[in-house]
Amino acid sequence: MSKRFMITAGGTGGHIFPAQGLAQELIKKTYSSSILFVAGGLSTNKYFDRSIFPFQEVSASPLFSKNPFKLLKGVFNLLRGVWQSIRIIRKFKPDVVVGFGSYYTVPPLLAAKILRIPIVLHEANSIPGKANKWLASMAWRVGIHFPFTATLLKGNTIEVGMPLREGYQLDQIDKIEALSYFGLSKNNSTLLVFGGSQGALAINRLMRNLANTWKNTPIQIIHITGSIQEADELKIFYANYQVKASVKAFEKNMHLAWRAAEVFISRSGASTIAEAMEFEVPGILIPYPHATDHHQDKNADFFVDIVKGGIKIVEEKAKPEIVLKSIQLLIDPIALDKRKSAIHSYKCRPDRTTLCELVLDTSELKSLHKAPQKRK
């Protein structure tokens, strides 16, 4: 029997990319199932692929504001968005509604609760966002990526792997082809460097200060700078020091960058850690110091202390000599193999399920009129 899934996600790529990854997994596993995205801001969201996924927009505004006018606007848009979502749900008739966080998702999830449609939430970060924290107790299940998150949510939490977009799987990409895409050699170790949407400038500055250390070493670099100006400047910088480097402002095919890399330097966003784990790449994490609730620190602690996949350096201590020493530790063949093996072991734990399986199981329980039992 065909299933119908409504997915609500909005805001940043950290919410949208896993949501689209889940949609692709559900379509692949169930074939005839229908997917509908419902949230605010989807028509203009740069991360959402409107050419692939059907969607409908509802009203939404931030709810947590000390400004009385913004608060009033938030309440009005919430009520309006809930009513719009109720009409959409009654027409679409989803078996399960899946939420990925941000205020954009609150109206559809409240509507699902009112209409008694099972809710599954996904919390990507170690420190839950306000929306998921508030809605967790209403959900049948909450998929979490970091074990620590369970202590901060009231819902029925289950650790799951992060849903990744189509093509972001280790066994789907040839390493030689990935290196060729960047014009790099299979005979050198490849360092992937990027700062993400937040704080790329500090990492770019760090790499400038390290440029003279790469000369005459077996290290080649893939550097995603986050801006065209930075990319142009760093291309010249690396060339002056005779460093083999592929420098780009942006890269749509990050799965190829991950497949080409032996080690990486980056911020510690949840998606970064999920992708590093999927491609089994050890790395140096420099948490973005201004992230909400310092969640990137907790994300990095998970990758370093629990997964045993890398080294954490706080930004104020990320001096060239410290980072260089850490890179040398990472690329040591014995240490590198040990960390890659640790990442693989954690990723492939038999007790670790996927969000897709969680959603499909919830839809089966719904058809049997059974609520899930809370795991102890």
From Swiss-Prot:
Reactions listed under catalytic activity: di-trans,octa-cis-undecaprenyl diphospho-N-acetyl-alpha-D-muramoyl-L-alanyl-D-glutamyl-meso-2,6-diaminopimeloyl-D-alanyl-D-alanine + UDP-N-acetyl-alpha-D-glucosamine = di-trans,octa-cis-undecaprenyl diphospho-[N-acetyl-alpha-D-glucosaminyl-(1->4)]-N-acetyl-alpha-D-muramoyl-L-alanyl-D-glutamyl-meso-2,6-diaminopimeloyl-D-alanyl-D-alanine + UDP + H(+)
Protein topology in the membrane: Peripheral membrane protein
Entry GO terms, CC: plasma membrane
Highest taxon of the lineage: Bacteria
Subcellular location: Cell inner membrane
Pathway: Cell wall biogenesis; peptidoglycan biosynthesis
Pfam families attached to this UniProt entry: Glyco_tran_28_C, Glyco_transf_28
GO biological process, one term: cell wall organization
EC number: 2.4.1.227
Gene Ontology molecular function: UDP-N-acetyl-D-glucosamine:N-acetylmuramoyl-L-alanyl-D-glutamyl-meso-2,6-diaminopimelyl-D-alanyl-D-alanine-diphosphoundecaprenol 4-beta-N-acetylglucosaminlytransferase activity; undecaprenyldiphospho-muramoylpentapeptide beta-N-acetylglucosaminyltransferase activity
SUPFAM superfamilies per record: UDP-Glycosyltransferase/glycogen phosphorylase
Top EC class, one word: transferase
SS bond list: none
Main location: membrane
Record's keyword terms, sorted: Cell cycle, Cell division, Cell inner membrane, Cell membrane, Cell shape, Cell wall biogenesis/degradation, Glycosyltransferase, Membrane, Peptidoglycan synthesis, Transferase
Binding sites annotated in the UniProt record for UDP-N-acetyl-alpha-D-glucosamine: T12, G13, G14, N125, R165, S197, Q296
UniProt-listed HAMAP family: MurG (MF_00033)
Similarity remark: Belongs to the glycosyltransferase 28 family. MurG subfamily.
Function field: Cell wall formation. Catalyzes the transfer of a GlcNAc subunit on undecaprenyl-pyrophosphoryl-MurNAc-pentapeptide (lipid intermediate I) to form undecaprenyl-pyrophosphoryl-MurNAc-(pentapeptide)GlcNAc (lipid intermediate II).
Protein name: UDP-N-acetylglucosamine--N-acetylmuramyl-(pentapeptide) pyrophosphoryl-undecaprenol N-acetylglucosamine transferase
